[in-house]
Amino acid sequence: MLSLRSVLKHCLSAKKTCSRNISALYITGDKANENYVTLQPYMDFNKTFGERQFLEQSISSRGLDIRLETVLSKYEKYKTHHAQLSKVAEERERVTKRLKELTKSGSSAVQLEELKEHGKSLRNELKALKQTLYPIEDDFIHDYLHLPNLLHVQCPVGGEEKLLYRHGIPKSENKTTSHLARQELVHFVDNNRYYLMEQAALFDVNAMQSLARYFVNHGHFIQTANPDFVRCVLLEANATPLSDYHLVQEEHLQNKINTAYLTGGASFESYLGAMTKLCVYPSVLPLRYVCCGRSYNRAEADLYGPIPSLYTATQTNAVQIFVATQTDNEADSQLEHILNLATDFYKALDIPFRISYATAADLTPAESIRAVIEVYAPSLQRYVCVGRISNYGDFVSKRILFSTRREKHYDFLHMVGGPVLYTSRLIAALVEHGVRLEDCKLLGSISQKPVHQQDLQQFKDLFT
């Protein structure tokens, strides 16, 4: 196994984007000999294109450069060739069946030879049709997989976010000194390298563990541990831009298109590997998981610049939430449940923060709606994201085949998740607000007596 130091060295030298000619999520038959087919996503063309009005609204509201008419024309071409292929395959199957019947009944050699020649002709025709269909299929399916999820009815489609909750009002004062001035707490080198010290280092760990414990004790979540690396097929299934994470340069790569990325264990994509091709009983739903770990997402680094700081750092400790439900209404309820727990945690810190729905233009193609948790950063004089929760509907579960069985058919699960805490940004905001980190009230924390008091109490217990 590669050490983290060598992995980061390779990651930092990798290109920001990865040019790909083949999708890891869908591989056509002509390329399956060279590349292992990891996953075959479920694609319901009739349902997708049957909701054309909502799909067009989703594309336009997100500002995506997708021409639905072009995709539909490719679909018609694909259907025509696929129908022709199916017709020849059925004819060949009938000839094969007929040949077996005549062989058993002892028919004439001439008749048997005619059927054999006809079967060979159909086999060659079928092979030629497959070779013709592969590029058509490849062109259409990859465009189809780029189509976005439908928007939630509550998702803002205009240019403004929808405010859900606000706590405290930022003080209208001059620009506050940056948290980087507190060099006894933060030694910042660049976006990829920084060191938290003393109370900042303690708060970094305690805040993460406390929030996870709060979700376990008060939200009935199960705490898990996830891998730091995710294969490309899962990023594509979640419609995550490959530039969001560092590409890992592997020395011995068996599947050249299904490369690995350094995401961190506290990433939504890190959960997907355990859920791929998984079928659960309805009785265990909803699934509620929480995870503490690292996050190496580069997507938001440019939002809070141009001056590098803890607000722009690409790595941080984080708390990740993952929930799976059977229906969309249950997913909405779980999203509200998560936000209520997160609100309690941030209210206890008593600094200005707000929760709002992000606009459609800010969503990834897989998200139907996103709730953003932001705290006020005095040095930037603006709100910065310290957490977010997204509703994905059944968009991702269809791609990774994550389902539940109900009677004689399968239902794809609705997924909700996201990081509810980025510790580095929260620390930066707290320091700039003049809050003593050791005095912060962390819901879910374990109150411990000083060691000498514990020892004294244990000594007293010996005589009681």
Swiss-Prot record:
InterPro entries: aa-tRNA-synt_IIb, aa-tRNA-synth_II/BPL/LPL, Ser-tRNA-ligase_type_1, Ser-tRNA-synth_1_N, SerRS_1_N_sf, tRNA-bd_arm. SUPFAM superfamilies: Class II aaRS and biotin synthetases (SSF55681), tRNA-binding arm (SSF46589). Its main location: mitochondrion. GO terms for biological process: mitochondrial seryl-tRNA aminoacylation; mitochondrial translation. It holds the Pfam family Seryl_tRNA_N. The keyword RNA-binding applies. This is Serine--tRNA synthetase-like protein Slimp. The gene is Slimp.
